[in-house]
Amino acid sequence: MLPLAGTEAGSVRFEVGAGGDRTMEVDRAAEAVVLSELAAVAERGELFSVLSEESGLRSFGADYPLVLVDPVDGSLNAKQGVPVFGLMLAVLDGPTVDDTFAGSVLNLNTGEEWTAIRKQGARRGGALISVIPRDDRKRFQILGLESSPRALKLAQPLVEHSNKIRILGSMALSIAHTASGGFDVFCAPMPVRVFDMAASLLLLSEAGGVATDLQGNRVGPLPASLDTRTTLLCAPNEGLHAEALAIVGKQG
């Protein structure tokens, strides 16, 4: 689907997808490739179901394992030709985020991949994730934010405590970079779809990171569905998360 990125053909809009967003040709093309590969797995006798942001739920003979597919996380970037978008795959053995036992986030532009298996750690490019040490303990080096304009205003206390901010426009890639320590903190101060986070939250957990909503509640028990939404505050370790949560708490 890369040849479609940033083109008029790739921006052609279709009906609203299962996730509630308008499906574009770049989404359809990427999903077709993924579903074709999963159908080939089913033909070899594997039983599972697939839940895609574009086409919804499809059964291949069993409710679980359930494969979550976001074929293009960062669709607007892809439409505009901004090379920051990725493929998110998560495999669950139950209905909640905590039930994610395998996850993959692929940067479709660079080919860089983050993977995680429950209780087996997280990897970036095949190597176990090693978080970059933080030098300045007084401020966050880089704060990552969700991309809606209101997020900047709502996260202002965190912004004022940070040296730099980054807004990638891809939830999966943002959390993946947090898991590997690129972001000291990532914040989505407005409710975002839990479905988009499933693979990245496993990466974060397996790498030793922490994720909660802005009130400090774990997001793991939430249903990993297309209609479940939550705020999000995550960091690559408990110390940074506690610091960020304290700052957000002062705002309330």
What are these regions (language model features)?
Residues 27, 75, 116, 178, ...:
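Residue-level signal for inorganic ion chemistry
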Residues 1-72:
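N-terminal subdomain of lithium-sensitive/metallo-dependent phosphomonoesterases centered on the IMPase/IPPase/PAP
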Residues 51-54, 69, 106, 145, ...:
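Short His-Asn-centered micro-motif
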Residues 34, 38, 87, 91, ...:
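Buried hydrophobic packing segments
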Residues 61-119:
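DPxDG-like acidic metal-binding loop motif
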Residues 41-42, 120, 131-252:
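An extended, acidic
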Residues 21-29, 79-81, 169, 194, ...:
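Short, conserved micro-motifs enriched in small and acidic residues
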